[in-house]
UniProtKB/Swiss-Prot annotation:
Location within or outside the cell: Cytoplasm, Cytosol; Endoplasmic reticulum membrane
Residue ranges, annotated region (Disordered): 69-117
Tissue specificity field: Expressed in the brain, primarily in neurons. In the cerebral cortex, mostly expressed in layers I and II (at protein level). Also observed in some neurons of the corpus striatum (at protein level). Expressed at high levels in the hippocampus, including in pyramidal cells of the CA1 and CA3 layers (at protein level). In the cerebellum, expression in Purkinje cells is higher than in granular cells (at protein level).
UniProt-listed PANTHER family: KELCH-LIKE PROTEIN 14, LD33804P
Residue stretches making up the BACK domain: 212-281
Kelch repeat coordinates: 325-374, 375-426, 427-473, 475-520, 522-572, 574-622
Subunit structure: Interacts with TOR1A.
Source organism, top-level taxon: Eukaryota
Protein name per the record: Kelch-like protein 14
Classification of source organism: Eukaryota, Metazoa, Chordata, Craniata, Vertebrata
Species the sequence originates in: Mus musculus (Mouse)
Length: 630
């Protein structure tokens, strides 16, 4: 109690508890809720005032300023509000001209005058939270309304992820405290993995103490097996090296004889060059033992030639994993601005969700990606949407998942978007496409050894929005648009003879589709064609037999129309991500996959960060601990 003249101020210590208790009762009874959050298809009705009072993300979103971290659908992995998605979805409009313009991207919907972004974030009443698990969101919301959060080793990672995405540092702190208190001999490996994934340095150090204590007691055979294990017991090759040094130093007189054998099992090229100098070369036996000297020298030489690393891959430079992951690169979101995405996302099949891996050096859509020795090449595309190809590019970049780094490579000789690119032996090929001059027939070949581009035999006809695949040492190109006309053509390129040959046409004209190879068959999936002046989704799936030069229509059509999806083959299925459905008049954020052996379609859980058309997909091996993009 305090006095000021005739006035008295009395503090009620129970008021805050009573207020929180009252808000919790309103939440439990679903009274006066004014916003709905959706995660993994599960809805949570909440109060904006509660969310904004605890979360910097929601405080920004519900104010007149865009949210931190790039806004809705930005770098923090949040999807666009449902209200915004619905307003952004273009409605199919009857064409105003008698024929498609020659340079227009065929099958790509134009923005309707009615397409508008939300002008007031306060109007947002429905939010789809991409990258948030329903379990994690439920537990975080319980904390907001009760000040208590229920944690276990099975749920703490999901709660931690949601707290970081939504910028709720109090929950993050509780998760870290829980992990630090729970570390034991039985669970330190699991805790160490979670700590590495989320950059929790203090927790990682505490967990590593248990690991080191265990490792020091191993005999030589057990230590050798540990260094060969997949996945590795620690998150980095440097940590594995330091662990090996500790084991050797623990009984130097007896164990130092094993140093060359153990060092051969380390992958020194996975350690960045500065750390090789500062932390590896400084260890005495790495300088004095001939075997160890050579291992260090080989790694340093590898780092000296970054532009040729994809040609010098060996066990010493490969990621310690054998599990390929599905990647989605770039793409064009809905909306009148039509600025392509610069996100690279990967699908976490354990968590059943898409997560942001990294950011490209530029925005891009209608580009191509090619995997080469687990490096990801990103070629061409357009950094702004323009129906005449005005913003087509000739950029070539290479992404290294080991160090989460990009380098720029020599550009293509021509700007091109809506083309096809592939790898064949020691070369990359880029075929057709479009730019400001129109449709292209040119074909360029990039030598992976010499880092140079050259022209090879052109396509018989200019083509854009076609699909391609590599089979048995030859390149197949199907469909596309030729001077405004959709075509069913199939061409085959022989790189040895440098000649193109016409093959049996598809049964259906189509463009902006996909062509994938599985079990010696080519599968043409998705796309659209014109009927009069209307775009129609192609629902039929066709299968081509290269030996018999014959197409067959499969009994199982695609689940829904998809023009311009990303496409990749992983294990026994063909994956299509995003794209545009003409029948639904909507950009897609979901992922569907087709299993040729079973003849079935399924839809994956979890959507990408925002609906996209014109992205590109690939499969690569990622490190065992993939940190979230910061």
């Amino acid at each position: 109690m305090s006095r000021s003249g005739d006035r008295t101020s009395t503090f009620d210590p129970s008021h805050s508890d009573n207020l929180l208790h009252g808000l919790n009762l309103l939440w439990r009874k679903q009274l006066f809720c004014d916003v709905t959050l959706t995660a993994q298809g599960q809805q949570f009705h909440c109060h904006k005032a509660v969310l904004a009072s605890c979360s910097q993300y929601f405080r920004s979103l519900f104010s007149s300023h865009p949210p931190l971290g790039g806004g809705v659908g930005g770098q923090d992995g949040l999807g666009a509000p449902k209200d915004q998605q619905q307003q952004q979805q273009p409605q199919q409009q009857p064409p105003q001209q008698q024929q498609p313009p020659p340079q227009e991207e065929p099958g790509t919907p134009s923005s309707s005058p009615d397409d508008k972004l939300l002008t007031s974030p306060r109007a947002i009443n429905n939010l789809v939270l991409q990258g948030c698990s329903s379990i994690g969101l439920r537990l975080v919301l319980e904390y907001l309304y009760t000040a208590n959060v229920t944690l276990s080793l099975d749920t703490v990672e999901e709660v931690l992820s949601v707290s970081k995405i939504l910028h709720i540092p109090q929950v993050t702190k509780l998760c870290v405290q829980f992990l630090n208190d729970q570390i034991s001999v039985q669970n330190y490996k699991q805790v160490c993995k979670i700590a590495a994934l989320h950059g929790l340095e203090e927790t990682k150090k505490l967990a590593n103490k248990y690991l080191v204590e265990d490792v020091l007691l191993l005999n030589f055979e057990e230590m050798r097996a540990l260094l060969d294990s997949l996945p590795p017991p620690v998150e980095s090759e440097l940590a594995l090296f330091q662990m090996s040094v500790l084991w050797l130093e623990h009984d130097r007189e007896t164990r130092m004889q094993y140093a060359p054998d153990l060092m051969k099992r380390l992958r020194f090229a996975l350690i960045p060059a500065p750390e090789l100098v500062e932390r590896v070369q400084s260890v005495d036996f790495m300088r004095t033992d001939p075997v160890c000297q050579k291992l260090l020298l080989d790694a340093m030489n590898y780092h000296l030639m970054p532009f040729r690393q994809h040609c010098r891959q060996s066990l010493a430079s490969r990621i310690r994993s054998n599990k390929k992951m599905l990647l989605l690169v770039g793409g064009l979101p809905p909306g009148p601005d039509r600025l392509p995405s610069n996100l690279v996302q990967y699908y976490d099949d354990e968590k059943k969700t898409w997560k942001i891996l990294t950011i490209m050096p530029y925005n891009s859509a209608h580009h191509c990606v090619v995997e080469v020795e687990n490096f990801l090449f990103v070629l061409g595309g357009e950094d702004q949407w323009n129906p005449n190809g005005k913003h087509s590019t000739n950029f070539v970049s290479r992404y290294d998942p080991r160090f989460n780094s990009w380098i720029q490579l020599p550009p293509m000789q021509e700007r091109r978007a809506s083309f096809y690119a592939c790898r064949l032996d020691k070369h990359l090929y880029v075929i057709g496409g479009r730019n400001e001059t129109g449709y292209l027939s040119s074909v360029e070949c990039y030598n992976l050894d010499t880092n140079e581009w050259r022209y090879v035999s052109s396509l018989p006809q200019p083509l854009a929005a076609h699909a391609g695949a590599v089979h048995n040492g030859k390149i197949y190109i199907s469909g596309g648009v030729h001077n405004g006309e959709y075509v069913p053509w199939l061409y085959c390129y022989d790189p040895v003879m440098d000649v193109w040959a016409r093959k049996q046409d598809m049964n259906t004209k189509r463009a902006i589709h996909t062509l994938a190879v599985m079990n010696d068959r080519l599968y043409a999936i998705g796309g659209n064609h014109l009927k009069g002046f209307s775009h129609l989704d192609v629902m039929l799936v066709e299968c081509y037999d290269p030996k018999g030069d014959q197409w067959n229509i499969l009994q199982t059509p695609i689940l829904e129309g998809r023009s311009g999806p990303g496409c990749a083959v992983l294990d026994d299925s063909i994956y299509l991500v995003g794209g545009y459905s003409w029948s639904m008049g909507a950009y897609k954020s979901s992922t569907i996959c087709y299993c040729p052996e079973k003849g079935t379609w399924t839809e994956l859980e979890g959507d990408v960060a925002e609906p996209l058309a014109g992205p590109a997909c690939a499969t690569v091996i990622l490190p065992a601990c993939v940190p979230y993009n910061k």
